[in-house]
A protein has these predicted regions:
Chain A
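Glycine-rich nucleotide phosphate-binding loop and flanking beta-alpha elements
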Residues: 52-53, 89-91, 147, 171
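Amide-donor transfer/coupling interface in amidating biosynthetic enzymes
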Residues: 73-77, 105-239
Length: 239, 83
């Protein structure tokens, strides 16, 4: 049976929402503290949103060196899925598990509102249930969400189809809307080459409950629930 | 020996620096329209124990590459003095 570790850093604040979204799709989830050196056997890791370590120095820069991140690095290197949401995405970039960086929003203001995004890459552990090109309305809530990367990195991400979510293209009337932060190529989420590590600025866990309206974020969690480890990496056979 | 090192971390040239732009607008509004090309970075001071000035600089460069600056978006300058 799959289990998910939701990592809690000092300053995480979307950890409970993430845990509940996972439980909603029938998968076991547990919190893992940032000082833990192990993921307690979890198959999938979520780095939730928030302001880990007060965003000191740069968003995600200190969290990257917390003890649990050593375990997350090993987990990712072994092909284990990792989903970073918002601050989690910033941590994944700082940890070099994903390329690029997330800088202060182009408009400087903290942006908290729903935005429209298109799901592009569906060959990931967290978007497999979506049809490519489907449009979702997901909330964003961030001050440092402007994705930047070197020109050749951006070309590589596009050429390899590693853009997972893209803000719906801007119009002439509102050059920064709905791209809420000035991200390069309107990028809202990317993945590693194999699709196991995914970073998203929008918050699917906040719209994963039908009680709160159209649950556009639920698919990320039903995808996660459908993920199975490749047989070759199973180290302990089930009894 | 202990060396006092000043690290200046700046957003890489060519990258949009919205904080610098906002400060420039504010300066202009306050009667300083002559200020231009404002960029906002970060200064970090630290003391480092090392055998020589060169060693101190090499150590702080490692610190910058690992943590103090983000190699994707920032450049840094060091100034090493005796403490």
């Amino acid at each position: 049976m799959l289990t998910v570790a939701v990592v809690r850093f000092p300053g995480s604040n979307c950890d409970v929402d993430a845990l509940r979204a996972v439980e909603r799709v029938g998968v076991m989830a547990q919190f893992v503290w940032h000082r833990d050196t192990s993921l307690h056997g979890a198959d999938i890791v979520i780095l939730p949103g928030g302001f880990s370590y007060g965003d000191y120095l740069r968003s995600g820069a200190i969290a990257r060196f917390s003890p649990v991140m050593q375990a997350v690095q090993r987990h990712a290197a072994d092909g284990g899925p990792v989903l970073g949401i918002c601050n989690g995405f910033q941590i994944l970039c700082e940890a070099h598990l994903l390329p690029g960086a997330l800088l202060r929003n182009a408009g400087l203001a903290f942006v908290s509102k729903p935005v429209d995004v298109v799901v592009e890459r569906t060959a990931t552990a967290f978007t497999s249930v979506f049809e490519p090109g489907v449009r979702l309305r997901l909330p964003v809530a961030h001050g440092d969400g402007r994705f930047v990367a070197a020109e050749d990195t951006l070309r590589m991400l596009e050429a390899e189809g590693r853009v997972v979510l893209r803000y719906v293209p801007a119009t002439e009337e509102s050059p920064l809307q709905p791209n809420p932060n000035g991200s390069a190529n309107h990028i809202a989420g990317i993945s590693n080459a194999t699709g196991t590590v995914v970073g998203l600025m929008p918050h699917p866990e906040r719209v994963a409950d039908p009680l709160l309206g159209v649950p556009d974020g639920l698919g990320f969690f039903t995808s996660l629930a459908a993920w199975r480890p490749p047989v070759s990496t199973l180290s302990t056979p089930n009894p | 020996m202990s060396y006092r090192v000043q690290v200046r971390v700046m957003p890489r040239g060519g990258l949009l620096d919205p904080q610098g732009q906002a400060v420039e607008h504010a300066l202009s509004a306050l009667g300083f329209p002559d200020a231009s090309a404002v960029r906002v970075g970060r200064a970090i001071e630290l003391e480092v124990a090392a055998e020589s000035r060169r060693e101190a600089e090499a150590r702080v460069r490692q610190m910058c590459d690992k943590l103090l600056a983000n190699p994707v978006t920032e450049d840094y300058l060091l100034e090493v003095g005796e403490s």
